Curated annotation (Swiss-Prot):
SUPFAM superfamilies: RuBisCO, small subunit
Protein name from the UniProt record: Ribulose bisphosphate carboxylase small subunit
Domain of life: Eukaryota
Task performed by this protein: RuBisCO catalyzes two reactions: the carboxylation of D-ribulose 1,5-bisphosphate, the primary event in carbon dioxide fixation, as well as the oxidative fragmentation of the pentose substrate in the photorespiration process. Both reactions occur simultaneously and in competition at the same active site. Although the small subunit is not catalytic it is essential for maximal activity.
GO cellular component: chloroplast
Length: 138
């Protein structure tokens, strides 16, 4: 099951050329970029691991592309994403986020149903990947 998180999640995976164009856009708008990775694909997992330091005041997209390449080499079977942060007063938020790397096999999720009083049903998601220990999921 394909993980759909981020700006381009319903499109085919971006090529390096397309990623570079998005990074050029990010840099041209004066946004800060950072690279994050995880092996826990749960939709509510918003705390991915930060790769290196955030790239503030970067003037060339190749610096961000270098960090993506380094992360891909070290974490080839992890989800890797780029975030663009706007520090403009009043915004101060992530304004763009997209996945740049995926594991070869994405096992998907188990939907768990629980019966509660009054015929109420509660649902939760469980990633099949998290059945293995952290660092050995893919």
């Amino acid at each position: 099951m394909r993980l759909t998180q981020g700006t381009f999640s319903f499109l085919p995976d971006l090529t390096d050329e397309q990623i570079s164009k998005q990074l050029t856009y990010i840099v041209s708008k004066g946004l800060s970029a950072n690279v994050e990775y995880t092996d826990d694909p749960h939709p509510r997992n918003s705390y991915w691991e930060l790769w290196g330091l955030p790239l503030f005041d970067v003037k060339d997209a190749s610096a961000v592309m270098y960090e993506i390449s380094s992360c891909r080499k070290a974490k080839p079977n992890y989800y890797i994403k780029v975030n663009a942060f706007d520090n403009t007063r009043g915004i101060e938020s992530c304004v763009m986020s997209f996945i740049v790397n995926r594991p070869i096999n994405e096992p998907g999720f188990l939907l768990q149903r629980q019966d509660f009083e009054g015929r109420t049903m509660k649902y939760s998601l469980h990633s099949y990947a998290t059945e293995k220990p952290e660092g050995a999921r893919y």
